[in-house]
């Protein structure tokens, strides 16, 4: 196992985002923990939620490892294999779980994460639902979603 830690900050937001993407492109797993077990001053003190850390990782083909937020929404949008819950209270046990997952990892797992993220997390799906509720879905949005579907079917 190797651990990279946080990507470096860039001179501007664009550079920082590129460092993050480069880091995710090298990763197989990303450690992330629900606020229920890892509170921080910049998170909600009582609410659990899935953050951009989880969704960006999944969209990059990376499996989330840690403690997933226990909410109805998270259970609805995530798929089997999107995340691996590990023992957050015992670092040795948690690392053993990560080592086991790393030993079983295949490139197909990363491809599956990307495919599933396109199907479940892409905002265009939500825009379609909003537009339907308003009575009309723009043809460009429909075309985008059809192209996306073709992409995740072909992967």
Enumerate the language-model features and the residues they cover.
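Nucleotide-sugar donor-binding catalytic core of glycosyltransferases
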Residues: 1-78, 123-126, 137-140
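A short acidic, often aromatic-flanked loop/helix-cap motif at beta-alpha or helix-coil junctions
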Residues: 9-13, 89-94
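Pocket-edge positions in alpha/beta enzyme catalytic cores
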Residues: 12, 49, 86-87, 118
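Active-site proximal loops enriched in glycine and acidic residues that flank catalytic Cys/His/Asp
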Residues: 68, 87-88
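A short acidic/histidine/glycine-rich donor-binding loop in glycosyltransferase catalytic cores
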Residues: 79-87
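C-terminal amphipathic helix plus adjacent low-complexity
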Residues: 84, 92-155
């Amino acid at each position: 196992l190797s651990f990279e830690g946080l990507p470096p900050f860039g001179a501007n937001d664009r550079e920082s985002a590129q460092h993050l993407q480069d880091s995710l492109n090298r990763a197989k797993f990303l450690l992330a923990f629900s606020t229920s077990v890892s509170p921080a001053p910049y998170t909600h003190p009582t609410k659990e939620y899935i953050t951009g850390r989880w969704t960006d990782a999944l969209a990059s083909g990376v499996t989330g490892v840690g403690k997933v937020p226990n909410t109805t929404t998270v259970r609805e949008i995530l798929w089997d294999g999107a995340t691996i819950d590990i023992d957050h209270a015992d670092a040795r046990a948690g690392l053993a779980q990560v080592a086991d997952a790393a030993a079983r990892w295949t490139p197909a797992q990363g491809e599956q994460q990307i495919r599933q993220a396109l199907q479940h997390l892409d905002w265009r799906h939500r825009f379609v639902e909003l537009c339907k509720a308003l009575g009309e879905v723009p043809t460009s949005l429909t075309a985008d979603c059809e192209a996306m579907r073709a992409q995740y079917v072909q992967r």
